[in-house]
Amino acid sequence: MHLQHYDEKNNVYFITTVTKDREPVFNDELACQLFINLLTYYKIKYYINIKAFVIMPDHIHLIIQSLGEQSISDFMKMLKGNFTRYYNEIINKNCHSKFQRGFYDKIIRNEIQLNEIFHYIHNNPVKRGLVCDPQNYHYSSYKFYYENDSRFKLLLM
């Protein structure tokens, strides 16, 4: 059954999207960089505010806010579809989708919930045993907020 997404301008959402068959697509640094580049491009095109993110080997968590007229569903469709297209052109020449259909979205209703999800996202690599400290995980917004690392400044501003 297809779940309805609640697209309302200015709402803040916790988004999770999972790779097809939980394939660890994002163990590849080039795949991570490609996703970051596309996320930055579509953030600008769709007027999306990216508040936090983590790219795990087999899934991605985002906290986003739509500021424009396009839906979150359209944003995710373009992001995932074009990632698959460019991934297949550049990295792996098969034509298969890299993501499961759809995505999970949850409206964040208050600051307490936002802080809990923010913490959850940044600690996901620790929870999964990928690093001992979130500051050691490269594809996360953690360092931007806690260490003034400017690597993802364009994405997060």
Identify what each model region corresponds to.
Residues 1-157:
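Short catalytic/metal-binding and nucleic-acid-binding patches
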